Amino acid sequence: MGRTRENKATVIADLKELLSEAQLGMVIDYQGLSVAEITELRNRLRPSGAICKVTKNTLMEQAITGDEAWEPMTNFLKGSSAFVLVKDDVGSAVRAYQSFKKDTKKTEFRGGVMQGQALNEDQVKAIADLPSKEELIGQVAGAINSIATKLAVGVNEVPTSIGRGINDIPNSLGRVMAAMAAKEEGNG
């Protein structure tokens, strides 16, 4: 028995909601994967804020119709399609999928969509090579901390230099006085 019209409308609405929250969508061919393997893929994707949704191409097509951000996905809707929708850590999710693909050798990457642009596998791999959000935050924090440390050392150096200069005045004055006395003795 097929889905009812109301059931299809609910599925389409759910897909639209998932797409509205996603940064990246990948279409993969899941033919040949067992239920256990699809569950394994979902478990690998979950920590990165991604989900794997298996649905009919026609329902996904209805969900993306009219949405410029996702319309390029229509080029990849053929055969047995699973949709990896990434909300949070794009790089981590792509790496999780690549690891799964390498381990199972059963999925085929059809294409990806990000910000209205169709992406091939090499472009998606390039995204995976970018540092994660946490790594970028760490790099920025390290740079800010480095600047603050250098500024503190520089600010601290000014009074230290003034102090050294003030401490040298009596010594310099003593040397000047000794030189003047030696000069007077030499003249006298």
From Swiss-Prot:
Q: Does the keyword rRNA-binding apply?
A: yes
Protein keywords: Ribonucleoprotein, Ribosomal protein, RNA-binding, rRNA-binding
List the GO molecular function terms: large ribosomal subunit rRNA binding; structural constituent of ribosome
Write down the superkingdom of origin.
Bacteria
Entry-linked CDD domains: Ribosomal_L10
Say yes or no: keyword Transport present: no
What PROSITE patterns does its record include? RIBOSOMAL_L10 (PS01109)
What HAMAP family does its record include? Answer: Ribosomal_uL10
Task performed by this protein: Forms part of the ribosomal stalk, playing a central role in the interaction of the ribosome with GTP-bound translation factors.
PANTHER family per record: 39S RIBOSOMAL PROTEIN L10, MITOCHONDRIAL
Q: What is this protein called?
A: Large ribosomal subunit protein uL10
User: Which species does the entry assign this protein to?
Assistant: Crocosphaera subtropica (strain ATCC 51142 / BH68) (Cyanothece sp. (strain ATCC 51142))
